[in-house]
Design a protein with these regions (language model features):
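Conserved eukaryotic protein kinase-like
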Residues: 2-294
Length: 294
């Protein structure tokens, strides 16, 4: 495993003008464009199941061996070509395997676009399950099970390898659920593999502006610094979403309630948090359990 991470660090340090992606078949399978087209019924609109970062379209597909997959179409469909961020995700996921991370099955790299073939998560994102259209309220025990699974995935990223991995975009729409309600972290395009010498310290983000998702970003993002606790901050916002049953920002609410973090902090300071949580959960959470969660 160690030599694979070393090769990944070399990839980040390279300055190649044309994206390259050469991976051993035993680590990551490379599909042909014909196989991808066949799996998605030639990218039929009925196969679209969502979008990912930077407007990438995600299709549900069936490979030639019958495996149901999610196929993310990156680059050419939006006119931007294949970016280093998209290559970054494939390179990184080839190094990571954990029950609470969405698994990479393979990829297809053409001249202008790339297709990332991922494990299919039949129940969609945590955001969809919590407050999506026609959602069914989840029991508190069920929500805790989902949170614990996602926390285990995040803990693996931070401590399960020689070099810490910072996800950099933890949010409820990047946590997915399979048929058995197992939660798994996805979307690693913005992730950072920290050099060994800085694995427990801050690292600078190599951009001219903060990247991530507004409302989930830790304060250090403002000065383009990143650490493992940045992910923990973002995950804390997700935990509030789970408790309140709403997104981190909702413009339809009164101004003082629009930003979830601010509203949660205010409710905690006033001792009214129990009255602010998801209506469905009221009377269904033991006070000692709620206090421990908070």
């Amino acid at each position: 495993m160690r030599h694979r991470f070393c090769s990944l660090l070399s990839f980040f340090a390279s300055k190649k003008k044309s994206p390259q992606l050469e991976l051993p078949e035993d680590i990551c399978r490379q599909f042909s464009l014909a196989q991808i087209k066949a799996a998605t019924n030639n990218f039929h609109p009925d196969s679209i199941i969502g979008t990912s970062y930077f407007g990438s379209i995600v299709y549900k597909g069936t490979m030639d061996d019958g495996t149901i997959v999610a196929v993310r179409r990156c680059g050419g469909s939006s006119g931007g070509g294949v970016s280093e961020l998209q290559l970054n995700e494939v390179k990184l996921l080839c190094q990571l395997r954990h029950p609470h991370l969405v698994s990479l099955i393979g990829f297809c790299l053409s001249e202008k676009e790339m297709f990332v073939v991922l494990e299919y998560m039949s129940r969609g994102s945590l955001a969809h399950v919590l407050y999506g259209k026609d959602h069914v309220p989840l029991a508190w025990k069920h929500r805790l099970h989902i949170c614990i699974g996602a926390a285990r995935g995040l803990h693996y990223l931070h401590t399960g390898a020689k070099h810490a991995v910072i996800h950099h975009n933890i949010k409820s729409s990047n946590i997915f659920l399979d048929e058995e309600w197992c939660s798994k972290i996805s979307d690693f395009g913005l992730s950072k593999l920290l050099p060994l010498s800085t694995s427990k310290a801050l690292t600078r983000i190599d951009t001219d502006h903060a990247v991530g998702t507004c409302g989930y970003m830790a304060p250090e993002h403002r000065v383009r610094l990143l650490k493992e606790k940045s992910d923990v901050f973002s995950f804390g916002i997700v935990l509030y979403e789970v408790l309140f049953g709403r997104p981190q920002y909702d413009s339809t609410l009164p101004e003082e309630k629009q930003y979830l973090l601010d509203w949660a902090m205010e409710s905690l300071s006033q001792g009214t948090i129990y009255h602010a949580i998801d209506q469905y959960l009221k009377g269904r959470i033991a006070p000692e359990c709620l206090n421990k969660y908070l």
